[in-house]
Amino acid sequence: MKSQWECVLENLGEWVGSFTTVTSQGEPIEDIPSVIKLAGISDNQAVHLVLNRFYPLPNSTEKYVKEVVWDFSTPPGVSVIYFETGAFSSGAPVVYIGVKTIAEFSLIAGDRRFRMIQTFDLAQQLDRVTFVREQLQGATTPERPQVDIADFVGTWTGIATTSYADQRPSIETNTRSTFSVSDTGYQLVEQDHSIDLTVIPDLPSPRLWQFTDDRDCQSYQILLLPDGGYAITPAKISLEHPFYLEIGWIYQTGQRQRLVRRYDSSGKWESVRFIVESIEQIGRAHV
């Protein structure tokens, strides 16, 4: 098993992409091109990071650059856990009313990365989602289209690795979930637990779904995004019940990765789960 630092090093390289921010309803706010370079130094005992983001100038076709430079020799991030592919999640160790909650996620597949920052306001209502689509400099892998209902339909099986905030040993478990669509609605069956989903009406495209998970009595939404990505969050975090924050990425047809960050009913961070799945059986979507 790799150390946390060895997992960090899976992210070395020059990644070209953009930071795209949308509202909680998926409406666009901004799209900022970016280049981030992570280079190993001192025989990979440390990493030199340079992030450049290219912002438009008012009334001009020119752009100005905001640069961040950072050297680090321990895994960066707050309450962060890395996994063997280089995937990671970081965020607040405790969620409070009156303090913004920010959670970051990153998934990696070959020469591509899909990252996300979920931001909740002072009342713990989802404020915005920033997703970052990147590929290594020189890579030619095409970006995937926005997730569609048909991409989920079928039975997914895989392996989940769960790492804990209290540093107890990680565990691996098998996963199995089935997503089905009919003329009457959408249903997810996961480990023998059934969830019904509803599309939010009056949006330009069916990119936002809602469901209630009776295991933790929270109402969640699923926001569908470009490049095969999606976010699952409470529309508003209720600190009376446990909750989770999730990112998913269908990085190629029938293949996906997920990160699930869990909190208990007091708002304390408990664990991060990294799931790698493939589709076993494809169903039929009625759209």
Predicted regions and their residues:
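Soluble ligand-binding/transfer domains with enclosed cavities or grooves
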Residues: Q4-V8, F19-R284
